[in-house]
Regions:
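Primarily recognizes the serine-hydrolase "nucleophile elbow" in alpha/beta-hydrolase
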Residues: 52-130, 355
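C-terminal catalytic histidine-bearing segment of alpha/beta-hydrolase fold enzymes
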Residues: 121-123, 169-247, 252-255, 380-387, ...
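Short, surface-exposed "cap/lid" segments of acyl-processing enzymes
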Residues: 1-7, 388-395
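Long, low-complexity, polar/charged, intrinsically disordered or flexibly structured peripheral segments
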Residues: 192-366
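Cap/lid segment of the alpha/beta-hydrolase catalytic domain
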Residues: 1-40, 82, 420-422, 426
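Alpha/beta-hydrolase active-site loop
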Residues: 32-56, 241, 432-435, 439
């Protein structure tokens, strides 16, 4: 953090870190007190403090830039979407927040794990071409919290065939298909161009184009970039050969005669060979509550709770659909019933409300007074090409929602895939970030 702060200061920026309650915050009795949406409440209070004291603090609090990746990217996107939302007024009044606005100026959303109300479905649409996955060490528990690390292999390189159901029960393939279909319907319901099979229409081809453009930019700028890849692949041609040799690019890549203009010709083949799936199904609200996202939904004693309304409802459908079916053994069907009951017990009306207000796309897609907010005028989403998490479909939904439903409220939204970058603040050259911020600030000062 210190190195990053120094770099920002050298660029002429003022970096502010706001203390906020979060998923690990406990009181003197070790009770958890950082439940959602309190991280948003505290950050908004910090923004209001900066604005209320703008005359005596360095910088300009009307030009706030949110910066974060993964869950931090999600929080930043939420700040940009929910500015001045009345939903938070009561919370802010309770903690004595300053009487000021809390909208921000620029959102830098790196691989934001957000829009959790549709995330489990979006991940199946995004990763449908990946027929195997690995699990992080934290996932080696069953649905009851028992350690099963002696029964399953975890960690990168230990892949399970999709549908292997390593946590027990014949559920994965069936639920994944339902989630995929639900997401196609969901995207279509907002008027976006997505074919019924989820693999044609501008919403799909536009996402694929992000990868094509990302690789093209990488190859075009390869000579000027500082990257460890150059130790093995001294020029763009050598790097391309690496894609053919190590990632089967003959099945998914077409390169123009110039040697740098790339086209991803088969998205699912590309996903299956280049991007690892690092989540089972369901991906974010996992059966064992052990996913990273599950850590945000805890009670005062730290017990995790299921949060996905969608998974709850689809499991309920499966219980009814297969009640008199011979598709599963009695033991397998009983497992599905127990899963459905576990989600139903956790996901109540309050959980539903929290999930909705913490999904930033809702502030853009809905036009009723409840969701009214002041959107950030500038949005920049970056996701690494090697990122197998939920960041790209989440950012893609936000980007399309902003351009379609809020074009008259914002000034710009850009989204890019940064090639050869993992789940991270993905930039192929950090100077690109500085140039983006400086350009917008210069335009603002000239107005």
């Amino acid at each position: 953090m210190q190195d990053v702060t120094i770099a920002y200061m050298q660029e002429g920026y003022v970096q502010v870190s706001v203390g906020a309650r979060g998923k690990d915050t406990v009181d003197a009795e070790d009770h958890y007190i950082g439940q959602l949406p309190l991280i948003m409440v505290d950050l908004k209070a910090g923004i209001r403090y900066l604005k209320a004291n703008n005359d005596v603090l360095p910088g300009d609090a009307e030009r706030i830039v949110s910066y974060g990746y993964s869950s931090g990217g999600a929080v930043g996107v939420m700040l940009g979407a929910s500015g001045n939302s009345a939903i938070y007024d009561g919370y802010l009044a309770d903690i004595g927040a300053a009487d000021a606005t809390d909208d921000i100026f620029i959102v830098l959303g790196y691989c934001p794990i957000t829009n959790l109300d549709s995330a489990d479905a979006a991940y199946e649409w995004f990763q449908a071409g990946n027929q195997e996955y690995f699990l992080f060490n934290a996932m080696a528990v069953d649905m009851y919290g028992n350690d099963i690390s002696d029964q399953i292999t975890v960690g990168r390189g230990n892949f399970h065939p999709f549908g292997d159901n390593v946590l027990g029960g014949a559920h994965e393939d069936e639920l994944a298909a339902k989630l995929y279909d639900w997401y196609v319907d969901y995207v279509q319901s907002w008027g976006f161009d997505l074919g019924d099979d989820g693999r044609d229409g501008a919403y799909f081809t536009g996402l694929v184009q992000l990868y094509s453009d990302g690789l093209t930019q990488w190859l075009t700028r390869y000579d000027e970039l500082s990257t460890p890849d150059k130790e093995k692949y001294p020029d763009a041609a050598a790097y391309v050969q690496h894609l053919y040799d190590d990632y089967g690019a003959d099945a998914w890549l077409e390169l123009a005669e110039d040697g740098v203009t790339a086209t991803i010709t088969d998205y699912d083949a590309f996903m299956g060979s280049f991007i690892s799936r690092n989540k089972m199904c369901p991906s974010l609200d996992s059966y064992n509550k052990a996913s990273n996202e599950g850590s945000a939904f805890v009670d005062a004693d730290g017990n995790r709770k299921h949060f996905s309304v969608l998974v709850r409802d689809l499991l309920g459908e499966m219980v009814e659909e297969y009640r008199d079916s011979d598709a599963f053994t009695a033991e397998e069907y009983d497992y599905i019933v127990r899963l459905a009951d576990a989600y139903a017990a956790d996901v109540d009306d309050e959980a539903t409300r929290l999930l909705e207000i913490m999904s930033p796309a809702n502030y853009v897609l809905h036009d009723d007074a409840y969701w009214a907010s002041t959107l950030a005028p500038h949005w920049r989403f970056h996701i690494g090409s090697a990122d197998g998490d939920h960041g790209l479909p989440a950012a893609w939904l936000m980007h399309n929602a902003l351009l379609t439903y809020a074009a008259d409220e914002i000034e710009d939204s850009v989204i890019e895939v940064s090639w050869d970058q993992p789940h991270s603040p993905a930039e192929i050259d950090v100077q690109d970030l500085y140039d983006y911020i400086d350009g917008i600030m210069a335009d603002a000062l000239s107005e």
